[in-house]
């Protein structure tokens, strides 16, 4: 027998008027938030956008979306240090999406299929000179060509690519991969003039009839270090070593090679020395591992190939076949201090990898140009120097020195150059708030192991064959589908199914959903189930 009385309470209308009892205090709206991968990409790629296309197997559309921001995906998939993956929310769940591996897959597939980028604008009648064919110069030239401008790159070297060609070993970046992506930029009408060192920018600007100039010569000169070296000592810079190897002129280093420094370039130099026949490649660094500049995986790869590292040691003297190091010790603040204890190390060659600087003296006499003490050029938010129509970027300006940062500079400069040429200043669109892991609703997700790239066995790493392989199409698809689509709706229909009032209508593929506030009770069922936080609940405005 049921002892409960029947429910005699009236049905309360919660959406249109204030009544006695509950009212709707909030209602849902669809939002777009900024994924952390997008936020941290130095090239400004819309990573989530091209990943969503890759998830659907729309490879060409994904590549076209990617190259709106970066013309070198096959290169970046190999050499970028992928800060996007360090920020990836999926790392809180199991492991980051291998964004760089998918980017590489798209770049390699584009080369294999012969895909070409579209032009976005009619010819403008304007000409732009780009000085330097490195990543920043190539990026700027590509973007300017897409915007309808006539572009010529002039570079002092015999081959385009800058430090991509002469600073990154082929076991990390095969030269055919690099040249294929550069050739695609050339196919857009960009003229690349080699063996042409620009020494008078203003004269070349006037002589060539250029309307603007972008200078991106990079930082290809080794920093001077004051270490006593005897006449018979064989000392080279890491910059010159990698340059010579890239030019096909491998030097003879001997059986024992010491590399001084612990940045990424030092790791490349030591691994290159092993490939050139050195029986022993020893990295010497004045501090400890926690303070090295190289990425941890770079050091691990070097160690796996037999490179040795001697920490807390500072070179004091270099002689023929040997060098003297002083042992260091960290003080209470973590700063290396000399101990007065010395050791002698045997070495046929010493490679100095202590940083690089830009050779910018040819710019110092141009009115309006301002240089920092280390030779970098000061630019404004629009990438323009103090000289009207003269822009600069890449390693030539202060800031982080990576390939991806340089490409981002080139894109940004191109957009500002375009605005300057058209007298329509470029303004970047405002960014949405960033969505963190705590804002996601992920119970529906299960662990999905990442797709691993194959590695060349250590025993076979004697030459400059590429060490890391690419993903198969199936693995690339799996990896793309690990993306959580943080902050942006991917039309999973979860909200549509969860609404108890049928207040949510589907607008069709690619158009999202719409909330009928006449039916919505503000229960937040849609918000609470949305896995990617593409829905927010906002307070209801109730008339006084």
Ranges and model annotations:
Residues 105-121, 180-195, 201, 222-276, ...:
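Glycine-rich dinucleotide-binding loop and its adjacent helix/turn
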Residues 233-255, 333-400:
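FAD-site-proximal beta/loop scaffold in flavoenzymes
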């Amino acid at each position: 027998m049921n002892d409960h009385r029947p429910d005699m309470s009236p049905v309360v209308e919660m959406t249109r008027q204030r009544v006695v009892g509950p009212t709707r205090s909030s209602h849902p709206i669809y939002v777009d938030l900024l994924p952390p991968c997008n936020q941290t990409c130095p090239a400004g790629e819309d990573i989530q956008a091209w990943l969503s296309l890759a998830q659907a197997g729309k490879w060409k559309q994904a590549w076209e979306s990617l190259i709106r921001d970066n013309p070198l995906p096959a290169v970046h998939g190999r050499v970028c240090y992928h800060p996007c993956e360090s920020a990836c929310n999926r790392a809180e769940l199991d492991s980051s999406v291998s964004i760089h591996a998918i980017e590489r897959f798209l770049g390699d597939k584009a080369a294999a299929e012969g895909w070409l980028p579209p032009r976005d604008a009619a010819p403008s009648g304007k000409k732009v000179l780009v000085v330097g064919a490195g990543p920043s110069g190539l990026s700027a030239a590509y973007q300017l060509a897409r915007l309808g401008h006539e572009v010529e790159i002039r570079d002092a070297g015999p081959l385009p690519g800058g430090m991509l060609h002469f600073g990154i070993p082929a076991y990390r970046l095969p030269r055919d991969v690099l040249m294929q992506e550069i050739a695609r930029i050339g196919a857009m009408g960009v003229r690349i003039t080699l063996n042409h060192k620009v020494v008078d920018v203003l004269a070349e600007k006037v002589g060539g009839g250029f309307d603007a100039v972008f200078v991106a010569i990079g930082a290809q000169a080794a920093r001077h270090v004051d270490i006593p070296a005897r006449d018979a000592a064989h000392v080279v810079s890491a910059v010159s070593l990698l340059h010579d190897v890239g030019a096909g002129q491998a030097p003879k280093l001997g059986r024992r090679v010491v590399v001084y420094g612990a940045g990424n370039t030092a790791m490349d130099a030591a691994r290159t020395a092993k490939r050139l026949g050195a029986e022993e490649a020893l990295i010497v660094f004045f501090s400890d591992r926690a303070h090295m500049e190289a990425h941890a995986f770079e050091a691990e790869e070097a160690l796996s190939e037999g490179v040795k590292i001697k920490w807390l040691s500072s070179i004091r003297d270099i002689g023929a076949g040997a060098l003297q190091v002083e042992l260091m010790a960290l003080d209470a603040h973590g700063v290396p201090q000399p101990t007065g204890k010395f050791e002698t190390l045997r070495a046929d060659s010493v490679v100095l990898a202590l940083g690089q600087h830009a050779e910018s003296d040819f710019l110092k006499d141009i009115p309006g140009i301002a240089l920092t003490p280390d030779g970098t050029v000061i630019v404004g938010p629009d990438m323009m120097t103090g000289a009207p129509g003269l822009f600069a970027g890449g390693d030539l300006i202060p800031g982080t020195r990576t390939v991806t940062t340089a490409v981002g500079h080139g894109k940004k400069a191109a957009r500002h150059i375009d605005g300057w040429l058209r007298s329509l200043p470029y303004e970047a669109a405002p960014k949405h708030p960033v969505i963190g892991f705590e804002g996601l609703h992920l119970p529906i997700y299960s662990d999905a192991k990442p797709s691993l790239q194959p590695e060349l066995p250590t025993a076979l790493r004697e030459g400059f064959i590429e060490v890391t392989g690419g993903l198969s199409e199936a693995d690339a698809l799996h990896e793309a589908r690990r993306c959580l689509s943080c902050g942006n709706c991917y039309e999973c229909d979860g909200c549509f199914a969860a609404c108890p009032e049928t207040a949510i209508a589907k607008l069709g593929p690619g158009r999202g959903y719409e909330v009928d506030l006449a039916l919505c009770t503000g229960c937040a069922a849609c918000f609470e189930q949305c896995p990617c936080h593409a829905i927010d609940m906002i307070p209801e405005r109730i008339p006084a």
